[in-house]
């Protein structure tokens, strides 16, 4: 229709949610729409540098009320221990009156939310549309509809028998379901009561799962694509000389790059197992991880004699690296990662072999999808009881995809190449955002 709308955004107050919501805001603003982003004042200061359209995206501050257990000055999950996340949810619930006042004053056409399940009812009362915008994978959302006693099997009607939880993976899911039940239930309620569901994914990867969610919730499911990534990594910025010069010393597709994001911390024993596993591959490697728990530096946590043994062919780095640029270097042949959202997409649009060691429940499910359903990656085997991986299992998994004569290595290489060609085809991912915005406009003007 081409008419412009005004959207309110009310994400969960964790930066892992607020930042993707701001990427959404940037895309809406790029298309000429107005956005009001609801956030605490301290969070706004950290988000503002990511606001690419300050004339179209306006922050409205909300003040969290005091609730028992919420520390003075705490505004986001970064201010709280894991055990106190429910307290933040309780405080966000008490913002209803503040938000209602802002809606009546600013008159948006729709409001995006993820965990606050009373938004659909309030939106209906105020005559605006509600959109449950989920940044977690469709595979994870779909499992919300599995009976708790049957986590080892997919829900009835589930489109894949392979994206299921078994062994230690099911234990991770059960732990999440029990300790985060308050979020679990909120998301499910929001999905079933909103006007529209939107998910940060694409049909080429999770199309069947999105169709399943649509049937379960009886709500239209819109896909945004990854929303913020340049799939071909063409930023124009060169790789830092330190890494470029080091990588230039190796043959094409010979180096194993390993990273787990800036928010994950290994236990020291598992960190050392990771290092030893990389050493055992016999391949050159670059590991970029945070220092393990209880260690202030990477060096103090390394196995005894490790640095001397791997000198010249391996680096373990404890700081930030330019991951997309490293992955685009011709010497990189394999990417070992946790299947976090950013790393997953960066691996899929790279030319590297992909090895996953998922850490969180949504990463576990996405790994199963990519490894067992699409067969574009492999997963490191773990102990069924502890969930830990051994240095030998890491070595064997990496070598299985780096060996040119390996059957599994050639299978995932072929499948990954086909999927990558689809994902980076001109205009594919940007077309998701365009279609998403067009469909939002239609829903705003529909009478249902």
Swiss-Prot record:
- Keyword annotations for this protein? Glycosyltransferase, Transferase
Domain of life, per lineage = Eukaryota
Which Cys-Cys disulphide bridges does the record give?
A: none
Please give the Gene3D superfamilies that the UniProt record associates with this protein. Glycogen Phosphorylase B (3.40.50.2000)
What EC class does the entry list? Answer: transferase
Q: Where does UDP-alpha-D-glucose bind?
A: 262, 321-323, 338-346, 360-363
Enzyme Commission number(s) from the entry: 2.4.1.-
InterPro entries reported in the protein's UniProt record: UDP-glycosyltransf_plant, UDP_glucos_trans
* Pfam families in UniProt: UDPGT
Q: Which GO terms describe its molecular function?
A: UDP-glucosyltransferase activity
Q: Which family does it belong to?
A: Belongs to the UDP-glycosyltransferase family.
The name under which this protein is listed is: UDP-glycosyltransferase 79B4
Name its species.
Arabidopsis thaliana
């Amino acid at each position: 229709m081409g008419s412009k709308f005004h959207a309110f955004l009310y994400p969960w107050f964790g930066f892992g949610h607020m930042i993707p919501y701001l990427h959404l805001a940037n895309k809406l603003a790029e298309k000429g729409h107005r956005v009001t982003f609801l956030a605490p004042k301290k969070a706004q200061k950290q988000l503002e540098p990511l606001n690419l359209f300050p004339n179209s995206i306006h922050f409205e501050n909300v003040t969290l009320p005091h609730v028992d257990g919420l520390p003075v000055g705490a505004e986001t999950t970064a201010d709280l221990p894991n055990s106190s996340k429910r307290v933040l949810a309780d405080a966000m619930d008490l913002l209803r009156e503040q938000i209602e006042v802002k809606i009546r004053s600013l008159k948006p056409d729709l409001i995006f939310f993820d965990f606050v399940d009373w938004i659909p009812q309030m939106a209906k009362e105020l005559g605006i549309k509600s959109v449950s915008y989920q940044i977690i994978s469709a595979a994870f959302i779909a499992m919300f509809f599995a009976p708790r006693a049957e986590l080892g099997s997919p829900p009835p009607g589930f489109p894949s028998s392979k994206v299921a939880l078994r062994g230690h993976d099911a234990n991770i899911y059960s732990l999440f379901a029990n300790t985060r039940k308050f979020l679990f239930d909120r998301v499910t309620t929001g999905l079933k009561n909103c006007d529209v569901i939107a998910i940060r994914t694409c049909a080429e990867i999770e199309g069947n799962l999105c169709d399943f969610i649509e049937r379960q919730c009886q709500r239209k499911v819109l896909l945004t694509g990854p929303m913020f990534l340049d799939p071909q990594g063409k930023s124009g910025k060169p790789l830092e000389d330190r890494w470029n010069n080091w990588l230039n010393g190796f043959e094409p597709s010979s180096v194993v790059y390993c990273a787990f994001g800036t928010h994950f911390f290994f236990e020291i024993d598992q960190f050392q197992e990771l290092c030893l596993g990389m050493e055992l591959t016999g391949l050159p490697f670059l590991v970029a991880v945070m220092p393990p728990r209880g260690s202030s530096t990477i060096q103090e946590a390394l196995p005894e004699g490790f640095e001397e043994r791997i000198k010249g062919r391996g680096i373990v780095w404890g700081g930030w690296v330019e991951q997309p640029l490293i992955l685009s270097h011709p010497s990189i042949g394999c990417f070992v990662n946790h299947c976090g959202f950013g790393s997953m997409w960066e691996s899929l649009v790279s030319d590297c072999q992909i090895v996953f060691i998922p850490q969180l429940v949504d990463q576990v499910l996405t790994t199963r999808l990519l490894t067992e359903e699409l067969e574009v990656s492999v997963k490191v085997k773990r102990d069924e009881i502890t969930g830990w991986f051994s240095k030998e299992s890491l070595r064997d998994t990496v070598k299985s995809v780096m060996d040119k004569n390996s059957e599994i290595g050639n299978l995932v290489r072929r499948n990954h190449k086909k999927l990558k060609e689809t994902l980076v085809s001109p205009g594919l991912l940007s077309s998701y955002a365009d279609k998403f915005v067009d469909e939002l406009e239609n829903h705003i003007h529909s009478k249902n």
